[in-house]
UniProtKB/Swiss-Prot annotation:
It catalyses: L-seryl-[protein] + ATP = O-phospho-L-seryl-[protein] + ADP + H(+); L-threonyl-[protein] + ATP = O-phospho-L-threonyl-[protein] + ADP + H(+). This is Microtubule-associated serine/threonine-protein kinase 3. GO terms for molecular function: ATP binding; magnesium ion binding; protein serine kinase activity; protein serine/threonine kinase activity. Its EC number is 2.7.11.1. Belongs to the protein kinase superfamily. AGC Ser/Thr protein kinase family. It is an enzyme of class 2 (transferase). It is found in: Cytoplasm. Residues 75-87, 117-128, 904-915, 1242-1256 have a biased composition (Polar residues). The active site is at D522. The keyword NADP does not apply. InterPro entries: AGC-kinase_C (IPR000961), Kinase-like_dom_sf (IPR011009), MAST (IPR037711), MAST_pre-PK_dom (IPR015022), MAST_pre-PK_dom_sf (IPR023142), PDZ (IPR001478), PDZ_6 (IPR041489), PDZ_sf (IPR036034). One of its GO terms (cellular component) is cytoplasm. Residues 759-792 have a biased composition (Basic and acidic residues).
Length: 1482
């Protein structure tokens, strides 16, 4: 008997009832659990009284066995009860298709269901939030396994388990056997099993309620017929258009499932949740009146499924399971392990019966009253009608076209600027006639809807759309970095890490799109744009299809197979190299086609070309269908994990293809094992584009040779009435764009009211501050009349709709305008203007429009107070002291920035470099010349404005600094108790690559509701000051001491960690050897004095433009630098950003070339010292300086250093003196102060792997978009032979240059050999030894190859014939491991010639390539050799004395003295480079 209790063995069934498994034992038949089995281990079936009828348990037959469980609601977690077993039929002998709850055929697998995972919601139909529906009819009679089954019962059970035939119960009814409960998704099981069970349940449902099913299907068909987007006029609002499409898709899917008898109550529940989410999106993201249409349509669909849903829920109710819950609760209460409260109260709460029924009636009455009031006031205010219905729609006249970005098959994309806001956008113009002829009108509406609806940092977003006479225009965010196809063309194959990041970000974009049912159908590198931070944005949805959004009830294999053939239009579209086999074979397709294209893209990233190619599409398609992938071998072989990923993505069968089951399959691949999917935007990209100007589109290929679209506007003969009514609906405004142009007058009124109400309580505090503000304004009005626009911006990205931001942008003509980014389109636009004579300081007024008269400076100290619950934070792109200020309601924080003298303010105005508005999207932009600072931010932070890395946000090529003392007003924390509510942590911040570190402190955690949280402190903030005292460099004990001395009130000044240059990286292996750079405590006044004293000391020593740069790194590839121009300069230039000081300024051709005036921070003219601040061509060759124990001269993170004209091969292009030159040489004789004398001691920058060569804008053949700016040697030679005489200014210019070079050479600590070549003036071109042959095997580098990631191997020099020098102008930026300098390598041939005339000329010194100490020790890492010399003949007075830069001190003195005494020409001769480590010293 004991063995029977322990193991009840039945043929084809094994019941393990041993206590070790903590299952219910037979020792306690009336209790669901034994004393040793806690509640969380209970099994959902229990033994009841033995007088019940024998239980008919499930059949193990193949047709009724357990299938895959697809039905898991997102809120249900991973509980076994989330599987769809609860929606199956009940198995009782008195009810057809009833399901059982006894021992199951699969008990042998040891699965234990946990009662603790049961949802807390009840089983009643009065709880709409219930995620659990029962599995049985409410009319069934419950059955149970016998306590001790007899032989007859065993025979009956075994016969039942072995057969699929029905059994007859005591009442004579036929009862079919049912399958056991379904469980979680597992491979290898039949996909039809689950469908069979649901079909039987639906059969019961249709038998019981035949009219309900027929009525639902009829109404669903009616909705689809009358409201289908193809049958109705498209909605003008893109978001609503997309939601409209999704609602119809949901109705169509419900109809298909009903006809296929696959309906469950859980499906209805999820359908209701999807509809509610769509309605919420419609109300939150649209202000159109068409919201009412979406609201009506969604409610209509909800009413259709309401009755069937209730009936199914009742039909699936499982009283046995309910009884089991009661017994389990009772047993658990007896044991005392869980429920301590009243058992009936617990059960009632589980049933959802705790609500007061009268409360709902009161709420309904209240709702009726509110509804009547709203109806009465409908004429005056409709909640669904925007507050400004008369707002002007966008039109083409609102934008001015700057230039063409690129051409496509359907239209062209132009860079445009909004005339009012001066923000840049990309405008896609599609010819309407072409659309009509190709019947593509509906498709362009789909593209508009997708772009408008999408809110994802990896998807390009649209701001507005409109139609003209000949075009449909879509205004999108401008992503400046070009596309990945151009990058591949110029670089060749990408390194694995770079490919992994690009691919991973595209996976996230694809996952987002697929969740909303969007199939891109045209994925390719051309449609992957690169943001200014080097991240990816997916664009071009012109061929996309919108299907059904993801539903968790559709995850079983049967539906997955249906999803792979979601579209049966038999249309072959896309780019041939990326089209999936099922599309070619016209078998129907779905989301897996995008994963096929992703496999092609990854292969192309890593190899450099696509795996399948052919001369014709037919040949290409034949390879796609039949051929295998050819993998590169040898040194070019791909890593095993990447090859495996590509192989799985390129499976011919779409069901076997990785990604078909969801993006999670791809994300879990070993190729991404080390990838942080949540921190992709925080990663520093290896390639960061560098923009030369506000309108720089040089990273894009215009493709004018392939496509040509008329840019002129329409014929006057064309009539607007000719456009169809459908096309007229194309004009729309997205949520993020419409906020800018909403009724600002109305908002300004509300703003003033809010200011007055919040400031009255602080009037006494602000009176003194306001007077000072007024006096400051009166002083500044006379000094500077530059207009300022103060715009209240709103961060409209998801999850941050309650935050608004104040952004001040300078309207100075010397300052770059802003551009828009994805999530940070300004919601309201205001400009600050002084009020009338009775103006009060604490009440600034905001009005719309440009400033006229004498507006206050944007740097004025005005008080900004909170607007109700709105948190304000400055996104200054030009304001001196506009600081971020997190404000709570009714609390105003004073701006505490240092005031400048008027002279310094005027100079700082000209040197501000405001970026695009997408910079404001991600970071705080501060250009504070007190500290020579800009800003730098990382995409993600609680304080950063957006996770969108678009349009030049915090581009490292802009000015940046860690001078955080003016970044944010102090956060004052008032603590009434013993704690402030935040956790402090000290971090080591290493100086560059060295072992020297400083201690910084960051906020590790902030408790919700604590005083620190209420004051605005957030986790991840770097603490810079405590009670006004700087804590940068203080040890942890000192900082804690400062906090403890504060008492109940502490003032903290913080900045987001990603707004600094601190990189986050792994712990250093040799951290024990680190040396902390301790800093003594000084008062702020003393620090300022010391800073000024050292600054003047440096200025007095050097007669050059002061450049300081410093970077801290502890691993986030961020760097920062600052630059200041001398007050004596005629105009203060716009610094291009991080600048690497140079030993040898580069010569530039055409000194008389006229460069157009530009507001670019990187473009300069001879009349501006901006060119002198620009790093010259050889700035990448920075030496080591004395007293430096760690690497220096490592290139700042992608500063805009132009390539040297010396590094390019001769070009047959004739000289064009009038062509604009972006980078005049710092040695041009325009200004006396032009030499470079950087403070090398502070150049501690992390390396960046990419170097972009900007290009000339002259009208050249579009052979290579990345080489247009490179100067040709012929231009230089022609200029050198032009016979121009030197002027006294030129002589002074050269003398100052020599002085600067003297100061630099005296500070060095390395012996730099200066070999004197017995040759004429030469241009030496360097080439890295033994380049990979992969670069030559793929024809993808017609232009500059910006990065070479080949392993450095010693080998022979590859010589290029003379006749090929002009053809191969592709420079390779090579970097050795641990190398501190960046060298541009070009191919050329060595032509050494020595003449008597050459020996009589001053000789060119050789500048040795400066490398780190580790490089000198590891010479096997790579060898640099001089490969080509390009002689430039000089004669007579045209000879240029050549500067001896790096000779020995003994010889350098005499050489320099001779140099000073000579007359010199206007253009310096180019320098000869040599990097031989064993160069001889003279």
């Amino acid at each position: 008997m004991k063995s029977r209790r322990d193991k009840l063995k039945i043929p084809s069934l094994t019941l393990d009832l041993s206590p070790n498994n903590q299952s219910p034992t037979l020792l306690s038949p009336c209790s669901p659990c034994s004393p040793n089995s806690p509640l969380q281990t209970l099994h959902p079936w229990s033994c009841r009284s033995s007088n019940r009828k024998s239980l008919v348990v499930g059949s193990p037959s193949p047709t009724l066995s357990r299938p895959l469980s697809p039905l898991s609601v997102p809120t249900a977690g991973s509980s076994p009860l989330d599987s769809p077993r609860n929606f199956s039929t009940s198995a009782s002998v008195n009810f057809p298709f009833a399901r059982s709850h006894g021992p199951r055929a699969d008990r042998a697998d040891g699965r234990r269901w946990s009662l603790a995972s049961l949802p807390s919601s009840g089983y009643g139909t009065n709880t709409p939030s219930s995620t659990l529906s029962s599995s049985s009819s409410s009319q069934e009679r419950l059955h149970q396994l016998p306590f001790q089954p007899t032989a007859d019962e065993l025979h009956f059970l075994s016969k039942h388990f072995r057969s699929t035939e029905s059994v007859t119960d005591d009442d004579g009814r036929r009862s079919p056997c049912m399958r056991p409960r379904s469980r979680s998704l597992s491979p290898g099981r039949a996909s039809s099993n689950f469908d069979n069970e649901i079909i039987m349940m639906n059969h019961v449902y249709k038998e019981r309620f035949p009219k309900a099913t027929a009525q639902m299907e009829e109404r669903l068909q009616d909705i689809i017929t009358h409201f289908c987007p193809s049958q109705t006029l498209p909605l003008a609002d893109g978001v609503l258009g997309f939601i409209h499409h999704q609602i119809i898709e949901l109705a169509r899917d419900c109809l298909d499932k009903s006809k296929g008898a696959l309906i469950t109550s859980r499906y209805f529940l999820e359908l209701q949740e999807k509809l509610e989410k769509m309605l919420q999106d419609a109300h939150n993201r649209s202000e159109s009146e068409e919201v009412m249409f979406i609201n009506h349509l969604a409610r209509k669909l909800l009413m259709v499924i309401a009755r069937p849903g209730r009936l199914l829920e009742c039909l699936e109710f499982d009283p046995e399971q309910f009884y089991h819950l009661l017994e389990a609760a009772e047993g658990q209460a007896k044991v005392g392990q869980g429920i301590k409260t009243d058992i009936p109260r617990y059960i009632i709460s589980q049933l959802g019966l705790t609500k007061d029924p009268l409360e709902e009636i009161v709420q309904l009455d209240h709702y009726d009253t509110e509804s009547s009031l709203q109806l009465d006031q409908e004429d005056y205010h409709d909640p669904y009608i925007p507050s400004t219905p008369s707002r002007k729609k966008p039109c083409e006249s609102d934008f001015e076209t700057i230039k063409l970005i690129s051409n496509g098959a359907y239209g062209a994309v132009y860079l445009v600027r909004h005339k009012e806001t001066r923000q840049r956008f990309a405008m896609k113009k599609i010819n309407k006639q072409n659309l009509i002829l190709r019947n593509q009108i509906h498709q362009v509406f789909v593209e508009r809807d997708i772009l408008t609806f999408a809110e994802n940092p990896f998807v390009v977003s649209m701001f507005c759309s409109f139609e003209t006479r000949r075009h449909l225009c879509m205004v999108m965010e401008y992503v400046e970095g070009g596309d990945c196809a151009t990058l591949l063309k110029n670089m060749g194959p990408l390194p694995v890490d770079m490919s992994r990041m690009y691919f991973a970000e595209t996976v996230l974009a694809l996952e987002y799109l697929h969740n909303y049912g969007i199939v891109h159908r045209d994925l390719k590198p051309d449609n992957l744009l690169i943001t200014s931070l080097g991240h990816i944005k997916l664009t071009d949805f012109g061929l996309s299809k919108v299907g059904l959004m993801n539903m968790t009830t559709n995850l079983y294999e049967g539906h997955i197979e249906k999803d792979t053939r979601e579209f049966l239009d038999k249309q072959v579209c896309g780019t041939p190299e990326y089209i999936a086999p099922e599309v070619i074979l016209r078998q129907g397709y779905g989301k897996p086609v995008d994963w096929w294209a992703m496999g092609i893209i990854l292969y192309e990233f890593l190899v450099g070309c696509v795996p399948f190619f052919g001369d014709t599409p037919e040949e290409l398609f034949g390879q796609v269908i039949s051929d295998d992938i050819i993998w590169p071998g040898g040194e070019e072989a791909l890593p095993a994990d990447s090859q495996d990923l590509i192989t799985r993505l390129l499976r011919q069968n779409s069901l076997e293809r990785l990604g078909t089951g969801g993006a999670q399959e791809v994300k879990q691949h070993t190729f991404f094992l080390s990838l942080d999917w949540n921190g992709l935007l925080r990663q520093k990209a290896e390639f960061v584009p560098q923009l030369e100007a506000d309108d720089d589109t040089s990273y894009f290929d215009t493709r004018s040779e392939r496509y040509h679209h008329l840019a002129s506007e329409e014929d006057e003969e064309t009539n607007d009435d000719e456009s169809s009514v459908e096309i007229r609906q194309f004009s729309s405004c997205s949520h993020r764009f419409s906020k800018v142009y909403s009724s600002s007058e109305h908002l300004a009124t509300q703003l003033n009211l809010s200011f007055s109400s919040t400031e009255r309580s602080h009037s006494d505090e602000k009176e003194e501050h306001g007077d000072r503000w007024e006096r400051t304004l009166s002083t500044e009005e006379e000094k500077n009349r530059l207009g300022a626009e103060t715009r209240l911006r709103s961060w409209t990205s998801s999850g941050s709709s309650h935050h608004s931001w104040l952004s001040e942008r300078s309207a100075s003509p010397n300052v770059l305008t802003s551009t828009c980014s994805l999530d940070t389109m300004p919601r309201f636009a205001f400009s600050s203007e002084e009020e009338s004579s009775d103006h009060k300081p604490e009440r600034p007024t905001f009005t719309l429009g440009e400033i006229k008269g004498t507006p206050p400076k944007p740097t004025s100290l005005c008080d900004i107070v909170s607007l109700s619950r709105t948190r304000l934070r400055s996104n200054s792109t030009g304001a001196k002291n506009s600081t971020p200020r997190p404000l709570e309601a009714g609390v105003s924080r004073r701006l505490r920035g240092h005031r400048e003298t008027p002279e310094k303010q005027s100079s700082s105005t000209g040197s501000r470099v405001p970026k695009s508005a997408s910079v404001s999207a991600l970071s705080l932009i501060i250009t504070s010349d007190d500290f020579g600072s800009g800003s730098l931010a990382s995409p993600i932070s609680p304080r950063s404005l957006s996770s969108n890395p678009s349009s030049r946000d915090s581009s490292p090529s802009r000015e940046s600094s860690v001078a955080v003392s003016s970044l944010r007003p102090p956060i004052i924390i008032h603590s009434s108790g013993k704690k402030y509510g935040f956790t402090l942590r000290a971090i080591r911040v290493y100086m560059g690559e060295s072992d020297v570190y400083t201690v910084h402190h960051m906020v590790w955690n902030v408790e919700d509701g604590s005083p620190a949280h209420e004051a605005g402190l957030r986790a991840g903030d770097l603490i810079t000051h405590v009670n006004g005292e700087s804590v940068l460099g203080l040890v942890h004990m000192d900082v804690v001491e400062l906090l403890l001395k504060s008492g109940s009130k502490v003032s903290l000044r913080t900045t987001p960690l990603e707004n600094t240059s601190i990189k986050i990286g792994p712990a250093r292996k040799n951290s024990c050897k680190g040396r902390m750079a301790r800093r003594t405590k000084k008062s702020r006044k003393r620090e300022n004095q010391d800073r000024k004293r050292s600054l003047f000391k440096k200025i007095s020593k050097q007669s050059t433009v002061l450049q300081t740069s410093r970077s801290f790194s502890s691993g986030l590839h961020q760097s920062l630098s600052s630059s200041e121009s001398l007050p004596a300069s005629p105009t203060h230039s716009l610094s291009p950003g991080p600048i690497t000081p140079s030993r040898s300024p580069a010569p530039d051709a055409a000194g008389d070339a006229v460069s157009p005036q530009s507001t670019s921070p990187c473009s300069s003219t001879p009349s501006s010292p901006a060119g002198h601040i620009r790093p010259s061509s050889l700035q990448c060759l920075t030496p080591k300086l004395s007293g430096q124990r760690y690497k220096v001269g490592r290139r700042k993170s992608t500063s805009s250093i132009p390539p040297s004209p010396l590094a390019c091969t001769p070009s047959p292009v004739p000289q064009q003196p009038s062509s604009p030159q972006r980078s005049p040489s710092p040695l041009l004789p325009s200004h006396p102060r032009s030499g470079h004398c950087g403070l090398q001691g502070k150049t501690l920058s992390p390396p960046t792997i990419v170097r972009q060569s900007s290009r000339n804008r002259a009208t050249e053949a579009p052979r290579s978009p990345l080489l247009k700016r490179v100067q040709s040697v012929e231009k230089m030679a022609a200029y050198l032979s032009s016979g121009r005489k030197a002027s006294p200014v030129d002589i002074q210019h050269w003398e100052d240059t020599v002085d600067a070079l003297e100061a630099m050479s005296e500070s060095r600590n390395r012996d730099w050999g200066a070999e004197k070549h017995e040759r004429d003036t030469e241009v030496v071109v360097m080439r890295r030894l033994n380049l990979s042959e992969r670069r030559d095997s793929f024809k993808k580098q017609e232009a500059v190859q910006e990065v070479s990631f080949d392993e450095p191997d010693a080998g022979a020099v590859e010589l290029v014939p003379e006749d090929k020098k002009t053809a191969r102008c592709s420079g390779l930026w090579e970097r050795l491991p641990h190398q501190t300098s960046w060298i541009q390598a070009r191919t050329g041939i060595s032509t050494p010639v020595t003449t008597e005339q050459e020996t009589s000329c001053r000789l060119v010194p050789q500048i040795a390539v400066q490398t780190s100490e580790s490089d000198e020790q590891e010479k096997s890492q790579g060898v640099w050799e001089c490969q080509g010399f390009y002689p430039l003949q000089l004669s007579g007075k045209d000879k240029c004395p050549l500067v001896t830069l790096l000779s020995e001190p003994t010889g350098a003195t005499s050489d320099r003295s001779q140099l000073k005494s000579e007359k010199i020409s206007e253009c310096p001769a180019p320098f000869a480079l040599s990097s031989k480590r064993d160069s001889k010293k003279n």
